[in-house]
Amino acid sequence: MNNSINHKFHHISRAEYQELLAVSRGDAVADYIIDNVSILDLINGGEISGPIVIKGRYIAGVGAEYADAPALQRIDARGATAVPGFIDAHLHIESSMMTPVTFETATLPRGLTTVICDPHEIVNVMGEAGFAWFARCAEQARQNQYLQVSSCVPALEGCDVNGASFTLEQMLAWRDHPQVTGLAEMMDYPGVISGQNALLDKLDAFRHLTLDGHCPGLGGKELNAYITAGIENCHESYQLEEGRRKLQLGMSLMIREGSAARNLNALAPLINEFNSPQCMLCTDDRNPWEIAHEGHIDALIRRLIEQHNVPLHVAYRVASWSTARHFGLNHLGLLAPGKQADIVLLSDARKVTVQQVLVKGEPIDAQTLQAEESARLAQSAPPYGNTIARQPVSASDFALQFTPGKRYRVIDVIHNELITHSHSSVYSENGFDRDDVCFIAVLERYGQRLAPACGLLGGFGLNEGALAATVSHDSHNIVVIGRSAEEMALAVNQVIQDGGGLCVVRNGQVQSHLPLPIAGLMSTDTAQSLAEQIDALKAAARECGPLPDEPFIQMAFLSLPVIPALKLTSQGLFDVEKFAFTTLEVTE
């Protein structure tokens, strides 16, 4: 006879169940009872009064019938409102530039008890070793850190140079890991729609789990075909009717509000009582400065309530229960008997003011998390080592020749969006007919010795200086934008010297730089230190012109060939709408 009861993503022994049942019946002593608390009812609306009873990791009972129940410890909630722990439905922790350990320290006290992350940033640089490190971090975390197995490494075959592959055989080795919830975003949507066998093999292999999508702006028969293949959700929607159509066709909608891609205002009007079980919240990419100053999922909930008048129970529903159901995490997302005791106590539910957080039945202490961070990071055995196999460059590497009277393609940036427009500009002896055009280059950093791929960028707001980074989705080559070849070379050489990182150059000097020693993506500094360094970088960048709110995150997506319309990879200028390389000069 099997001596344990298994759920999809957690395991509880028969002995634990017997103890939990005894507390539920009132025959045994609870570990904790939370008194003076109201529970927000995410199913019916309104509130439930009465204590919350906890045994081990689980809730044993809820309601006034437990007012006199015995407990080893009682927590006085002082009239707080209790809600389930918040869940981020899709993110890349690497984009915070924090390690998973530091990320937990920064976000768990804000109520973020669960994350569904795709570590494809580090997998693109290091391959399976990067995924293995994330799994080690997830295993030791207090926060529920679940992993989607990265499906597109690189993002699009044959369009860029990256650091490693992640084969189906390697992916399958992680499929049954207890922290794995499914297959991460399938970015090659044209390949799926056309029925490429290699992609269908991946979908088939993970079909019993959750299949994440990625299809910005997709509609019509192509969207139908993509969903027919089994894709279940999308976090890339940026227009109201696009989101509505995906919901109508059975997709779940992840409403994203990151540091660069900000889609909440466009999509929040869709949320209602009927479709909220199919709506989730995610950040995708959010930097440590915003987390420290504005928050994480708590910030998104606050905006739904204050700016979009979403009812409390619906706002908290899409931040927890909806996501838990979607990913089969049936032990999460509700404050109910038998559920894991991931609880956020709010002194003000409308303002999402977090008073206390419990995860897996234990109160969280922010100072303890900070004190243990260094030791826990060391225990995870981070994959240190220089991943920048690139020699220093000179200004001549960025020299472009232009012919007066000719027209040249320009990548046009849309502030706070990941999509770009493809426009053009005419060159004359006095320069381009647009004064906002600057230069952009992408340099592969994995030892292939390719010449820099160079192009033109408009709308970014760079009036002087140069910015360079090794955070450049998804292959994470070196991306640099600038007004002069000399300053571009200086910025690139600084990030090479740092072993990866971010840099701002102005007036011929490095004004600010941030080394990222893990894969050229992440720092080992504390969240507070990292936020301060990001603040200094942003201040230096603002001196270069009216840039996007998050210039480095916006810049990081200019080389991603799966988001429209015109991008630059290490192999050249890529027309995303045609899924083909194109020329800098317009000849057609």
Curated annotation (Swiss-Prot):
Pfam name, any one: Amidohydro_1
GO molecular-function terms, A-Z: adenine deaminase activity
Cofactor(s) needed: Mn(2+)
Keywords: Hydrolase, Manganese
EC number(s) given by UniProt: 3.5.4.2
Catalysed reactions, semicolon-separated: adenine + H2O + H(+) = hypoxanthine + NH4(+)
CDD domains, sorted: AdeC
PANTHER family reported in the protein's UniProt record: ADENINE DEAMINASE, N-ACETYLGLUCOSAMINE-6-PHOSPHATE DEACETYLASE
Quaternary structure (record): Homodimer.
Protein name: Adenine deaminase
Source lineage: Bacteria, Pseudomonadati, Pseudomonadota, Gammaproteobacteria, Enterobacterales
